[in-house]
Amino acid sequence: MTQFASPVLHSLLDTDAYKLHMQQAVFHHYYDVHVAAEFRCRGDDLLGIYADAIREQVQAMQHLRLQDDEYQWLSALPFFKADYLNWLREFRFNPEQVTVSNDNGKLDIRLSGPWREVILWEVPLLAVISEMVHRYRSPQADVAQALDTLESKLVDFSALTAGLDMSRFHLMDFGTRRRFSREVQETIVKRLQQESWFVGTSNYDLARRLSLTPMGTQAHEWFQAHQQISPDLANSQRAALAAWLEEYPDQLGIALTDCITMDAFLRDFGVEFASRYQGLRHDSGDPVEWGEKAIAHYEKLGIDPQSKTLVFSDNLDLRKAVELYRHFSSRVQLSFGIGTRLTCDIPQVKPLNIVIKLVECNGKPVAKLSDSPGKTICHDKAFVRALRKAFDLPHIKKAS
């Protein structure tokens, strides 16, 4: 399988913004921490046959480096420090940190090494997997079809929002990791740029080249790693929130809530955290229930919800975003991150439901116990039990 051996990726910045934000925090706070992460396909796709092609792409990634114009652009952003950017200039992907194999038809991928380096593999590697699989499965699909689908959905969107005050509606592209291709994502984002409510992209390469605002703060792995970094498991989520504020005292302040369920998060999200963080991000569970809990929590703490932002990013499409906007827009600031339903929305193309998640930190297990049972990840059942006990979680959800 070498007919598509040309590199999929052309820029080190072809990744999600929060990866660089987290990498800088790891560089400054946890330079010597080691981690392991694993690939998961949440669907029934047997992707093992693509292992050789993916391995070739992994080897090609070692040639990516931060270019001078990219370095200058990052330097102009308000939250990156010179020591980190100078280190990033010298960074190269190390393919020895990645094992890719065909396990009886299933694609098996494991990453391991220093967290400061391993952290950058996830998003571009998922984008590579998605693009390689779609090249083989859907050679007939093209950019024009993706654009036609978007245009049709924008017509529906206009009808759906007719007469609605859209001044508080903000949409972001979160579509890098499961895109049909790099070309499709860029085309979709360029089209969305024409809409007044489109405010940015999570992709740093696109943000730089298209003069867009880069969007993103932190991911589950930030909270997961602290389960072993923090000496007290019950305090690990608060430790993660506090360490983030040390790195970014007054910027990049949207906190992800579902590493150990929303209820457990809110118990840790006291008045100081709630005041200093600019808002919260939803990534699993019922979005209306989650939003109501968030607003009630702010009100209980004496904080005006209108001063905070709720970001919705779980399996969204334009219609769902409008439904949530109608429900919440008068009470809180809102942003919506849409991924797969923008960048892999082509007739007869089945998007991949794929992730890469942390499974170990410093040789010990970590877990994600989200608000959606199917998103729970951990190998070690004893650790899951310890985590549930530490965070007083009432019912068992299957670890996968």
Swiss-Prot record:
Domain of life: Bacteria
Modification type Phosphohistidine: residues: 220
EC number annotated for this UniProt entry: 6.3.4.21
Pfam families named in the record: NAPRTase (PF04095), NAPRTase_N (PF17767)
Lipid metabolism listed as a keyword: no
Post-translational modification: Transiently phosphorylated on a His residue during the reaction cycle. Phosphorylation strongly increases the affinity for substrates and increases the rate of nicotinate D-ribonucleotide production. Dephosphorylation regenerates the low-affinity form of the enzyme, leading to product release.
One of the GO biological process terms: response to heat
Enzyme category, top tier: ligase
Alphabetized UniProt keyword annotations: Ligase, Phosphoprotein, Pyridine nucleotide biosynthesis
Biological pathway: Cofactor biosynthesis; NAD(+) biosynthesis; nicotinate D-ribonucleotide from nicotinate: step 1/1
Any one Gene Ontology cellular component term annotated for this protein: cytosol
Record GO terms (molecular function): ligase activity, forming carbon-nitrogen bonds; nicotinate phosphoribosyltransferase activity
Reaction equations catalysed: nicotinate + 5-phospho-alpha-D-ribose 1-diphosphate + ATP + H2O = nicotinate beta-D-ribonucleotide + ADP + phosphate + diphosphate
Keyword Transmembrane: no
Purpose of the protein: Catalyzes the synthesis of beta-nicotinate D-ribonucleotide from nicotinate and 5-phospho-D-ribose 1-phosphate at the expense of ATP.
Similarity section: Belongs to the NAPRTase family.
Annotated protein name in UniProt: Nicotinate phosphoribosyltransferase
Organism the protein comes from: Escherichia coli (strain K12)
Lineage: Bacteria, Pseudomonadati, Pseudomonadota, Gammaproteobacteria, Enterobacterales
Name of the coding gene: pncB
